[in-house]
Swiss-Prot record:
InterPro entries referenced in this protein's UniProt entry, alphabetically: Chloride_chnl_CLIC-like (IPR009231)
Highest taxon above the source species: Eukaryota
Taxon lineage: Eukaryota, Metazoa, Chordata, Craniata, Vertebrata
Positions of post-translational Phosphoserine modification: S438, S464, S532
Site positions per UniProt: Ca(2+)-mediated inhibition of channel activity: D25, D181
Name of protein: Chloride channel CLIC-like protein 1
GO CC annotation terms, alphabetical: chloride channel complex; endoplasmic reticulum; endoplasmic reticulum membrane; membrane; mitochondria-associated endoplasmic reticulum membrane contact site
Cytoplasmic topological intervals: 206-216, 351-542
Organism: Bos taurus (Bovine)
Sequence ranges of Low complexity compositional bias: 480-491
Residues bearing PTM Phosphothreonine: T482
Membrane topology, from the record: Multi-pass membrane protein
Originating gene: CLCC1
Stretch forming the signal peptide: 1-18
Amino acid sequence: MLYSLLLCECLWLITAYAHDDEWIDPTDMLNYDAASGRMRKSQVKYGISEKEEVNPDLSCANELSECYNRLDSLTYKIDECEKQKRKDYESQSNPVFRRYLNKILIETKKLGLPDENKHDMHYDAEIILKRQTLLEIQKFLSGEDWKPGALDDALSDILINFKFHDFETWKWRFEEFFGVDPYNVFMVLLCLLCIVALVATELWTYVRWYTQLKRVFFISFLISLGWNWMYLYKLAFAQHQAEVAKMEPLNNVCAEKMNWSGSLWEWLRSSWTYKDDPCQKYYELLLVNPIWLVPPTKALAVTFTNFVTEPLKHVGKGAGEFIKALMKEIPVLLHIPVLIIMALAVLSFCYGAGKSVNMLRHVGGPEREAPQALQAGERRRQQKIDYRPHGGAGDADFYYRGQISPIEQGPNDNTYEGRRDVLRERDVGLRFQTGNKSPEVLRPFDLQEAEAREHPKVVPGLKSPNLESKPREMGEIPGESTPTESSTESSQPAKPVSGQKVSEGVEGCPAVEKAQLRTDAAGGPEEGSTCSPASTAVEVCG
């Protein structure tokens, strides 16, 4: 009986449990399975008291706390994964950076590492960044999949050419800022300064342009001589270095001592062939300095050739381009007439240039002052004119006779100047006789006065015919009228004894003053005349 009751209770529980599975709770949609149409079985909750199971109000709070717990566990797992991944990442990158730092230490150790004496060392290195290197670095920094080997190769090729830091190279430089060498700027400014000095001081006015042009050509020729010698020496040195490089395989052969078999072979080679001895060429290159290959005569010949041909080359090149461009637009039938016209034009230009050479002599430099014309009505008075150009730079004659104005002359200057001019005129006559040359320039009135002394003119009514036979009566010194001393007699003025008394008596006469001016201009009476202009004036006034 008891067994039957127990069996009935079990069956009732089983049927009740089956009915519970088919029942759908509308408030518990989380456990509802839409595919089977039944409610899911709730899991057994451990650690939950019976009071909580019984209380339906706390079901949502329990589910929320369960979700938070699950979220915390997932976050913890993610952190653990990140840590593990970071450890793996660092384990792969550490060897790369170790090798990179090791390379830096090896390169700097060659130059010297800091020690107790030198606490700081400054090095310079070059960085070469390729595209593949840049991609590997970007992958590493962004956390993408990167390869340690590729990154290691990229870092090892970045830093090269380690050297000590040169503080001078980092200073400010003139050529880097302006793009011009300071030496060239200095030379240009020096040339400009020379030109400004010439213009400001007017030195070019004292030297003729033709002389300046000759000097410029001469200086240019001297500079070109040294220039071409240095150029030829550089060429010879470069050729010598190239020949030495070609003869390098013969260093060991020609340096060794030759035995009997080698000498026999060399004799046969020189006897039966026309080839030069390579060792002779080798020792010539070894012993002969290239400086001996460029003598001054060679530099002189090259300089003279370039001095003549180089300008003609440029002229010919320009003329060829001009003719080519001109003939390109002209028909073929007109080529010959155009060439003939051009040849005639060139010949005309050369002829005109040759005719104008004489005009170039008058360009530049001060000209000599033209002699003044003779004054009408009286003899030209000898004026104190500077007949030499002012002293200048090199070529001009030196100025030694200053101009003296009448205000600055003293009472005895007229007599002194007249005597000096007479002496100069005597020297001119002697130069004509002996043929000597002098830098002194003869003026037209010098020749006229010399002819006047040789052929004196007789003034009618003022000169007595008997005066020539009585020279001593007028106060002349005896013996001065001999033919052998005619030049000396003509150079010294007559000294009449009674001239002073006569001049005192007729001081206010205009004719006397005019005669005195003529005496000052002529420097003395004419040769062969015994009466002075003053005495003649006395007769006229008297």
